[in-house]
Regions:
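Well-ordered beta-strand positions in beta-sheet-rich domains
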Residues: 93-95, 106, 110, 133-135, ...
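A structural micro-motif recognizing beta-strand termini
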Residues: 99, 155-159
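RNA pseudouridine synthases
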Residues: 1-122, 127, 140-143, 147-148, ...
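Pseudouridine synthases involved in rRNA/tRNA modification
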Residues: 1-14, 20-26, 130, 144-151, ...
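Long C-terminal interaction/binding lobes of large macromolecular proteins
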Residues: 136, 154
Length: 219
């Protein structure tokens, strides 16, 4: 991991950071530096020790997924942000590169997701799972070139927030994400999945907020 996280937005109650590939959001017990550590150190450097102590991530991204991660900075307003997560009040869009040519232009993938009983690292589509909805729009179909196979550049809107949801849903459509080492085929480029934007009404100020993280790769 060479890139440093970048602050995209910050006020008294909320911070948004652009997470690079290779960094985890929360600690996993190994002592590895996390995005939460980075945000806490940044707040301490800004002289805001209370926020550095109180902060909580409002969303999480897999290690190799890049893009927007939100942090609540204030205990008093944390419940309001938590309720927004429950109410799905955050509109989240991802950019991704999927294997193969997707024939449809736009689709709502509505398939329940459960844990994979045969592999603890994975999730799967299954009737016993939790309701899960992903809206996918094809932005561009990329023809094979220079030895690369046909791929589809897509905009993905998360309507629910299950673990590995985008990866599982696209794999279930026979279009796994490029570079997905769990549900597809590993590639040198890594996982082509980027949390591009989040939009919401600020629970304190009432202001409409739209935050974007520039995509680190070209389709």
């Amino acid at each position: 991991m060479n890139e440093e996280p970048q602050v995209l937005y910050c006020d008294a109650w909320l911070m948004a950071i652009d997470k690079p590939a290779g960094m985890i959001v929360h600690g996993d017990g190994t002592g590895e530096r996390t995005l939460t550590d980075y945000a806490s150190d940044l707040l301490l450097a800004m002289g805001d020790g209370f926020a550095a102590t109180d902060m909580q991530p409002l969303n999480r991204l897999d290690r190799n997924t890049t893009g927007v991660v939100l942090f609540s900075l204030d205990k008093q307003t944390q419940p309001a942000f938590d309720q927004m997560v429950i109410d799905r009040a955050f509109e989240k869009h991802y950019l991704a590169l999927a294997e193969g040519k997707i024939d449809w232009n736009e689709k709502l993938i509505d398939k329940p997701i459960a844990r994979d009983r045969h592999d603890s690292r994975k999730m799967r589509v299954g009737a016993s799972g939790k309701p899960s909805q992903t809206r996918v729009k094809v932005l561009k179909r990329l023809k094979s070139r220079r030895g690369l196979p046909t791929r589809s550049y897509i905009d993905v809107e998360l309507l629910t927030g299950r673990k590995h949801q985008i990866r599982v849903h696209l794999a279930s459509e026979h279009h796994p994400l490029v570079g997905d080492d769990l549900y597809g085929t590993p590639r040198p480029c890594g996982l082509m999945l980027h949390a591009h934007s989040v939009s919401f009404t600020h629970p304190v100020t009432g202001e409409y907020i739209h935050i974007e993280a520039p995509c680190p790769w070209e389709p």
